[in-house]
From Swiss-Prot:
It comes from the Bacteria. This is Probable potassium transport system protein Kup. Residues 1-20 are annotated as: Disordered. It comes from Azoarcus sp. (strain BH72). Pfam families: K_trans (PF02705), K_trans_C (PF22776). The gene is kup. It is a multi-pass membrane protein. It catalyses: K(+)(in) + H(+)(in) = K(+)(out) + H(+)(out). Keywords: Cell inner membrane, Cell membrane, Ion transport, Membrane, Potassium, Potassium transport, Symport, Transmembrane, Transmembrane helix, Transport.
Length: 638
């Protein structure tokens, strides 16, 4: 069951908890440090890949102008128009991201086949994020450290070891959180974008006419004259917009206005000035295509620039890693993933979490990518395909929102879909040529994560149906208590359950084995709403039944942290006070047994049982004191 009190708006604003405490300029600076790290490090490798990659575009004036025009209009169409102007208006109580967008789309669709497909799309888009999250740190840090080769070729053997040291250090430090250094991310990235702009302007002086590349006719002519080369080039041009989808995912931290201000006032101009500078440099010295970004840097400043670029890529990688932690928590809350150990790394910022299992999975994959691909150019072949797929999914989900939730007219909504989906498909089709060169990796990771998420969701549904079919109705149970009442003992017993109208198995087992009931018996259900946060005033519902029995329903948003003792503390306002020292929590611990005809293929059934056995403790996940927990085992045929 979901809480139906949320309000969807067209036009996301900064969350009240942050937007009213900080000025919009301060939030914009903070957003630059988190939201734009990924796209902000794209100049390190984008044009190098275009003119020096496996499908290298020949260097001549028409081609350089055409590519720069493509980059500009990709940034305008995909990032500026689609994400900054349109999709960021689709906020779910101030929150963004593909989970929030999926929730908005499902809210206006009747249950059925269409809703199922939208749900599948949303989950697949979320799964693709993990593949992207593995490649981003690897390609970003590698491309930064490769600047040492520009300073002197003698550093070439040390690039991989240095990159690995940086990356391993980054993941090892996750346990400590970023609270102590997070405040400097914004100012550091502001400096980074200012440096990008200055380097770009310096390069533009070599060929001032390069500014004419803003004319879309250059891009059109490039495609008309060389359609195949133009199409293949899109597979590298897409690197300029990777990370654009992140600005919507992080909207909940800063709000729409600061993200929009940061993009149009600094990030977009700085990025494109740098691309123009690199283009001018390539026209002036075609040999510079081997690393046009670092060739823009004066010789005396190459080493400091490598240091600054490495710091910028660390910040960009941190945003992706934190995003993976946050997405995992949302998946757990929404019932798509088993419980995992989740640690808070800050006493002040509730959103700063650390998920050890995800952290080490990402580290292992990142190290394998760096060792396996050896260079940022090789990694570029694996990059982009997952991002473009995610962007296509965002467009489809956004179309449902603008048509059904915002009530746009059919013509206007279809125009939105056709324009942006055409651009997305063009980029995606161009990246498909990378599949055998490395693009298979994020697709494989995405497919694997998607399978895990859907298997867990389906398995939990089947398990709940099985338990439900064997559950005794609560009213019949209470009537039997009147006929032959068992002894009552002091205190309160809390039984967590999925159905408040049935008797939890743990309650029956306790009664059968211990022959007693507590003075107060509380049946507690936890619901996750399709909104990011549920206000404290709407956290709990209490219903007194009879014979000392109570029903308590606790509501959380998909970005809230479940804390059952804290929630029960709110029940006093509803006439049901709790004393934790007099309260025992009875949790059922099921042992699953496979059977024929369970409703899932045998391999998925075995996978679900494996996931179930390794799921984290319910007591830990719900912050229940271990010394107040009683676990009662039961066997269930799946």
């Amino acid at each position: 069951m979901q809480v139906e009190h949320e309000v969807a708006t067209e036009g996301g604003q900064a969350p009240a908890s942050s937007g009213h405490r900080k000025g919009i300029a301060g939030l914009a600076v903070a957003a630059i440090g988190v939201v734009y790290g990924d796209i902000g490090t794209s100049p390190l490798y984008t044009l190098k890949e275009v003119f020096n990659g496996p499908h290298a575009v020949p260097v001549n004036e028409a081609n350089v102008y055409g590519i720069l025009s493509l980059v500009f209009w990709a940034l305008v169409t995909v990032v500026s128009a689609k994400y900054v102007v349109f999709i960021t208006r689709a906020d779910n109580r101030g929150e963004g991201g593909i989970m929030a967008l999926t929730s908005l789309a499902l809210r206006v669709v009747q249950p059925g086949r269409r809703a199922w497909w939208l749900s599948v799309l949303g989950v697949f888009g979320a799964a693709l994020f993990y593949g992207d999250g593995m490649i981003t740190p690897a390609i970003s840090v590698l491309s930064a450290v490769e600047g040492l080769e520009v300073a002197t070729p003698a550093f070439k053997p040390f690039v991989i070891p240095i990159a690995l040291v940086v990356l391993v250090g980054l993941f090892v430090m996750q346990r400590r959180g970023t609270g102590s250094v997070g405040a400097i991310f914004g100012p550091v990235m502001v400096c980074w974008f200012l440096v990008l702009a200055v380097l770009g302007i310096n390069g533009i002086t070599l060929h001032p006419e390069i500014i004419g590349a803003l004319d879309p006719r250059w891009a059109a002519r490039f495609f008309i004259d060389q359609p195949l080369i133009g199409w293949l080039a899109l597979g590298a041009v897409v690197l300029a917009i990777t990370g654009g989808e992140a600005l919507y995912a992080d909207m909940g931290h800063f709000g729409r206005r600061p993200i929009k201000l940061a993009w149009f006032s600094l990030v977009f101009p700085a990025l494109y000035l740098n691309y123009l500078g690199q283009g001018a440099l390539i026209l002036d010295h075609p040999d510079n295509v081997r690393n046009p970004f670092y060739m823009l840097v004066p010789d005396a400043l190459v080493y400091p620039m490598v240091g600054m670029a490495t710091l910028a890529t660390i910040i960009a990688s941190q945003a992706v890693i934190s995003g993976a932690f946050s997405l995992t928590r949302q998946a757990i809350q929404l019932g798509y993933a088993p419980r995992m150990q989740t640690l808070h790394t800050s006493e002040h910022e509730i959103g700063q979490i650390y998920v050890p299992g995800v952290n080490w999975m990402l580290l292992g994959a990142v190290v394998a990518l760096v060792v396996g691909f050896q260079s940022s150019s090789a990694l570029a072949s694996a990059y982009g395909i997952a991002v473009t797929l995610t962007m296509m999914i965002d467009t489809v989900l956004a179309f449902v929102v603008v048509r059904s939730l915002w009530k746009w007219g059919r013509a206007k909504a279809v125009l939105f879909l056709v324009v942006f989906l055409a651009v997305d498909i063009a980029f995606f089709s161009a990246t498909t040529v990378k599949i055998f060169a490395g693009g298979w990796f994020p697709l494989l990771i995405g497919a694997a994560i998607f399978t895990l998420l859907r298997t867990w969701k389906r398995g939990r549904s089947l398990l709940n149906e099985r338990i439900r079919s064997d559950t005794m109705p609560l009213d019949i149970f209470i009537q039997s208590m009147f006929q032959s009442p068992p002894p009552r003992v002091e205190g309160t017993a809390v039984f967590m359950t999925t159905w408040l109208d049935g008797v939890p198995r743990a309650l029956l087992h306790n009664l059968i084995h211990n022959k007693v009931l507590h003075e107060r018996v509380v049946l507690l259900r936890v619901d996750t709403a399709d909104v990011p946060h549920v206000p404290e005033g709407e956290r709990v519902e209490v219903e007194e039944i009879d014979y000392g029995f109570y029903r308590v329903r606790v509501h959380y948003g998909f970005k809230d942290d479940p804390d059952i003792p804290a929630a029960l503390g709110l029940c006093a306002q509803r006439g049901l006070p709790f004393d934790m020292m007099e309260t025992s929590f009875f949790l059922g611990r099921e042992t699953l047994v496979s059977r024929v005809g369970s409703g899932m293929p045998q391999w998925r059934e075995k996978l679900f049982i494996l996931l179930f056995r390794n799921a984290g403790s319910a007591a830990d996940y719900f912050c229940i004191p271990p010394n107040r927990v009683v676990e009662l085992g039961t066997q269930v045929e799946l």
